[in-house]
Amino acid sequence: MPESLMDIRVEHKAFAGNTVLHGIDLSLQSGEIVSLLGPSGCGKSTLLRIVAGLEQDFRGSVQRIQGEVAFVFQEPRLMPWLTVAQNIGFSDDDRYDRRWVAQLIEEVGLSGFADALPKALSGGMAQRVAIARGLYSHPAVLLLDEPFSAVDAFTRMKLQDLLLQLAARHAITLLLVTHDVDEALYLSDRVLVMGSRPGTITHQLPVGLQTPRDRRDPLLARLKAQALTELQQAHVI
């Protein structure tokens, strides 16, 4: 069995007395891709913030076995006064690893844009920068909160394929929040369905397909029907 990188247990998480997460027990294994699928307000993003260490007011624990954790947000959140290279390297001077940044720029398909400012980038290009920035610290786990929701369908598919290539190349574990059933099934080794508040994991759906996957694969269609059934049974759609 692959080595466990993180063990996440959330017994209880509340905001202003309202319980948003309850009874979460999740382990992330080395090299796997896991998606959290559910409706708005079920606590997916809150769970991701707990895993990242950005939210610490909860009852439970997050045990990180090894490696760093990085976060890619829904919006790229690039600093407008910094170049692409500087945004990736978290610095406005030469203190960042220029060789590593140059490699990441090439890997995400932005060769020639190292000195460009964010205002010169399309939405898809800006999100490529955000992904490269997430990889800069050589993380073992990359957390992504609906990273492709703001781009068009064709760009989304290209970014999904890019993410799979990068995860395989750098042997990174991914934990992804999404509302998109097709995206979850195309990317993931496991899809975790979350129910309405208080949010908890109601079903785990393994995806037994090798990558790269054919989006037209009949098995994906059958898995989508199963995922939608699980969402209906959890009273979330």
UniProtKB/Swiss-Prot annotation:
The keyword Transcription regulation does not apply. It is a peripheral membrane protein. One of its GO terms (molecular function) is ATP binding. PROSITE patterns: ABC_TRANSPORTER_1, ABC_TRANSPORTER_2, SSUB. Pfam families: ABC_tran (PF00005). It catalyses: ATP + H2O + aliphatic sulfonate-[sulfonate-binding protein]Side 1 = ADP + phosphate + aliphatic sulfonateSide 2 + [sulfonate-binding protein]Side 1. Its EC number is 7.6.2.14. This is Aliphatic sulfonates import ATP-binding protein SsuB 1. The gene is ssuB1.
